[in-house]
Swiss-Prot record:
Family membership: Belongs to the DHHC palmitoyltransferase family.
Keywords: Acyltransferase, Endoplasmic reticulum, Golgi apparatus, Lipoprotein, Membrane, Palmitate, Transferase, Transmembrane, Transmembrane helix
EC number(s) reported in the record: 2.3.1.225
Transmembrane parts of this sequence: 10-30, 49-69, 126-146, 147-167, 183-203
Example of a GO MF term: protein-cysteine S-palmitoyltransferase activity
Protein role: Palmitoyltransferase that could catalyze the addition of palmitate onto various protein substrates and be involved in a variety of cellular processes. Catalyzes the palmitoylation of KCNMA1, regulating localization of KCNMA1 to the plasma membrane. Might also mediate palmitoylation of CNN3.
Localization per Swiss-Prot or TrEMBL: Endoplasmic reticulum membrane; Golgi apparatus membrane
Name of the molecule in the record: Palmitoyltransferase ZDHHC22
Expression sites by tissue: Widely expressed.
Annotated source species: Homo sapiens
Length: 263
C-alpha cells in the first residue's frame, strides 16, 4: 500500500515534468526554427499555425486533466447504514479505493497519473484527456522530427529511419558529432511516441467499454450489465453537448442518469 501511495504522488509529478519539458522545447526550439523561413507569409506562417495547434491540443489535455481531478467520483452516501471502509457497498458498480480512501460510484479504475479514481463524474474528461494527450505527444514528435531533420540533415524518407535514429545518434553523441540538446530532443521523440501510442490505446479501450455500457471494474468482477443501445451508452457518458466538450474542456454533463441507476 505504501508503494501505491508513493506511485500516486510520483506519477502526477512525472506527467507535469513531461508537460513542462514539452512546452519548453516547443517554445524555445521548435517555434524559433520555424520562424527562420523567410518565404513564409506572416499571417499564415508555419510558426503561427504550429503554435496555435499545439496550444489547442495542450489546453484541452491539461484542461481535462484538471477536471478529472476536480470532478471527484466519490459518493459517500452510496453505502448507507455502515462505514464505507468496513462494509462493501451494495451496488456492484460502487467500489472503495484503498489508495484514494473513498467510495467511487461506477468505479472504472484508479489512475495514478491523475492521483484520482475514474468514475461516472469524470469518465468523459478522462477519455478526452487521453485523446488530447495522445494527439499532443504525437504532434510534438512530428515537430521534433522536423527539427532534427533540419538540424542534423537527416532524411526520414526511409521507413526504418526512425527506428535506427536512436542507436546512430548515441554513437554520434559520444563521438561529439551530436550536441547534448539535440540528443535530448531525440530521446524525447521516442518518449512522445511511446506516451502517444499508450494514451491512444487506452482511449480506444475506454471507448469500447463505454459502447458496451461497462466499466473495467465490472469486467474484472464479471458483473453482467443490462444490454442497451450504444448511442444511449455514449450519451450517458459524453452528454448531449458532446461536440462542445470536444473543443472546450468542461464539466461532465452526462453522468446524472448513471448516478440515478446505481442508487
Amino acid at each position: 500500500m505504501l508503494a501505491l501511495r508513493l506511485l500516486n504522488v510520483v506519477a502526477p509529478a512525472y506527467f507535469l515534468c513531461i508537460s513542462l519539458v514539452t512546452f519548453v522545447l516547443q517554445l524555445f526550439l521548435f517555434l524559433p526554427s520555424m520562424r527562420e523561413d523567410p518565404a513564409a507569409a506572416r499571417l499564415f506562417s508555419p510558426a503561427l499555425l504550429h503554435g496555435a495547434l499545439f496550444l489547442f491540443l495542450s489546453a484541452n489535455a491539461l484542461g481535462n486533466y484538471v477536471l478529472v481531478i476536480q470532478n471527484s467520483p466519490d459518493d459517500l452516501g452510496a453505502c448507507q447504514g455502515a462505514s464505507a471502509r468496513k462494509t462493501p457497498c451494495p451496488s456492484p458498480s460502487t467500489h472503495f479505493c484503498r489508495v484514494c480512501a473513498r467510495v467511487t460510484l461506477r468505479h472504472d479504475h484508479h489512475c495514478f497519473f491523475t492521483g484520482n479514481c475514474i468514475g461516472s463524474r469524470n469518465m468523459r474528461n478522462f477519455v478526452l484527456f487521453c485523446l488530447y494527450t495522445s494527439l499532443a505527444c504525437l504532434y510534438s514528435m512530428v515537430a521534433g522530427v522536423a527539427y532534427i531533420s533540419a538540424v542534423l540533415s537527416i532524411s526520414f524518407a526511409h521507413p526504418l529511419a526512425f527506428l535506427t535514429l536512436l542507436p546512430t545518434s548515441i554513437s554520434q553523441f559520444f563521438s561529439g558529432a551530436v550536441l547534448g540538446s539535440e540528443m535530448f530532443v531525440i530521446l524525447m521523440l521516442y518518449l512522445w511516441f511511446a506516451i502517444g501510442l499508450a494514451c491512444a490505446g487506452f482511449c480506444c479501450h475506454q471507448l469500447l467499454l463505454i459502447l458496451r455500457g461497462q466499466t473495467r471494474h465490472q469486467v474484472r468482477k464479471g458483473v453482467a450489465v443490462r444490454a442497451r443501445p450504444w448511442r444511449k451508452n455514449l450519451q450517458e457518458v459524453f452528454g448531449k453537448r458532446w461536440l462542445l466538450g470536444l473543443l472546450v474542456p468542461m464539466f461532465n454533463v452526462g453522468s446524472e442518469s448513471s448516478k440515478q441507476q446505481d442508487k
